[in-house]
Regions:
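Glycine- and Gly-Pro-enriched alpha-helical subdomains that act as flexible
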Residues: 10-32, 45, 202-220, 230-243, ...
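Catalytic cores of alpha/beta
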Residues: 44-46, 116-120, 140-144, 167-184, ...
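C-terminal helical cap(s) of enzyme catalytic domains, especially alpha/beta-barrels
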Residues: 1-4, 65-71, 198-218
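Small-residue-enriched alpha-helical segments and adjacent helix-cap loops
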Residues: 141-146, 150-167, 218-266
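Active-site beta->alpha loop and helix N-cap motifs at the rims of alpha/beta catalytic domains
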Residues: 2-140
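Generic structural signal for well-ordered alpha-helices
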Residues: 114-121, 142-147, 180, 206, ...
Length: 268
């Protein structure tokens, strides 16, 4: 289906820079992109290496919360608990003005971006937009929403919500990387929210989100390995060697390790 939309005048596809946004707490501005994780099933465990910045708990705040993680609740059940923030949908705009939270989230599909929504965002710079799309071309809709915000002169940060139903980690990785890659390279991403209804664990989904941001060179969370694929000029077992290197160095966050196997182009 056709996606109505126009490119923002200030956007340059040939040399994109990060979209100018007004920081709301640790989201937007000069901050690194955040990761929002789903825990609507009540589970709270996280991998210390890939701890999300925010956990969306839906309608029920868990009794035991992860230290250092803030929680997002639906606005109609949010009661102002410390370390929690409300999330509105576009039908709840009238309630937003009555809420005193210094950080608010707004779930918004592109086609719901009415004049009323634009007017609301102009008077509520504390709102972080969570862009949603069920369109076959979800990248196109996410882009259209961002370009509309830029055209209107709005500087609200935007987090991209991506919905999947995958049972294999590689399938989730490939699909979510494709969906998010262009948005990151265009400088439009202030955060990522992967929601998976398949059988994958939360730890896998969280690690995928952080991995995408690292691959996009926007946030580092683990050791990075750059290896040649191996060919007839490789005189040793490259895969086993890589596994040994990873086992010894995977805790060295921020380090980039190059692995060469070629007797012609590298020492091996």
């Amino acid at each position: 289906p056709y996606i109505p939309g126009m490119e923002a005048p200030e956007f340059n596809y040939l040399s994109p820079s990060r979209r100018k946004t007004r920081a709301v707490r640790n989201i937007g501005g000069e901050h690194l992109p955040v990761v929002i994780a789903d825990r609507m099933d009540g589970k709270t465990e996280v991998n210390p290496q890939f701890t999300p910045d925010y956990i969306y708990a839906g309608r029920t705040l868990p009794e035991q919360r992860e230290e250092g993680v803030e929680y997002i609740l639906d606005a109609d059940v949010w009661e102002g608990e410390a370390g929690t923030w409300p999330a509105f949908n576009h039908a709840q705009l009238p309630l937003m003005g009555e809420c005193s939270a210094e950080l608010k989230f707004l779930f918004m599909p592109y086609m719901a971006q009415t004049d009323e929504v634009i007017a609301c965002l102009k008077v509520h710079p504390e709102v972080v937009v969570i862009s949603q799309s069920n369109h076959p071309n979800r990248l196109g809709e996410h882009r259209a929403l961002l370009h509309q915000l830029m055209t209107e002169g709005l500087e609200n940060p935007v987090v991209f919500f991506q919905h999947y139903a995958e049972d294999e980690a590689e399938d989730l990785l490939i699909k979510s990387a494709v969906d998010m890659g262009a948005l990151i390279f265009d400088g439009l991403c202030d955060g990522i929210f992967l929601f998976n209804q398949g059988s994958l664990s939360h730890a896998v989904v969280d690690a995928t989100a952080f991995g995408i941001l690292q691959a996009g060179r926007t946030r580092t969370s683990k050791t990075e390995y750059i290896s040649c694929p191996g060919c007839g000029r490789t005189l040793y077992d490259l895969e086993k060697t890589i596994a040994r290197i990873k086992a010894a160095t995977s805790h060295l966050k921020g380090l980039k390790i190059g692995i060469m196997g070629c007797i012609v182009n590298g020492p091996g």
